[in-house]
């Protein structure tokens, strides 16, 4: 709906893809906690969509099954939302419209640059400007 505020966060600590299940379960608990707040506010005031960025793709976690999603375990599925091709992240036919925008693409390219640096130097955290 209208009036939504969106914010992406990228963390310095690199994760293993198999951590995504527990991360999504934790964000679900956070969403439920916010939903239990006093009445009068939105039914779902916070929507957290964790995922990870790899050099070749952006993966999101979800609790909803669909033909292009892979079951990871504990009720969590993964979706490759974007794939890297010819210098940019490109959408698939199922990619949500907002993930197709130039603004989001720029953000993911910046995060990819930081990830490349972190992987190149074999550190757990990238340079300060990342």
Per-segment meaning from a language model:
Residues 2-5, 15-35, 39-129:
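Long, contiguous binding/interaction regions
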């Amino acid at each position: 709906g209208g009036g939504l505020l969106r914010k992406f966060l990228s963390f310095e600590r690199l994760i293993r893809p198999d951590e995504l299940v527990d991360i999504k379960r934790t964000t679900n608990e956070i969403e439920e906690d916010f939903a239990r707040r006093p009445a009068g506010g939105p039914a779902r005031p916070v929507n957290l969509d964790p995922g990870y960025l790899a050099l070749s793709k952006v993966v999101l976690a979800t609790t909803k099954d669909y033909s292009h999603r892979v079951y990871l375990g504990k009720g969590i599925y993964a979706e490759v939302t974007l794939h890297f091709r010819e210098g940019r992240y490109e959408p698939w036919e199922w990619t949500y419209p907002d993930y197709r925008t130039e603004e989001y693409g720029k953000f993911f390219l910046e995060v990819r640059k930081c990830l490349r640096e972190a992987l190149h130097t074999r550190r757990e955290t990238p340079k300060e400007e990342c």
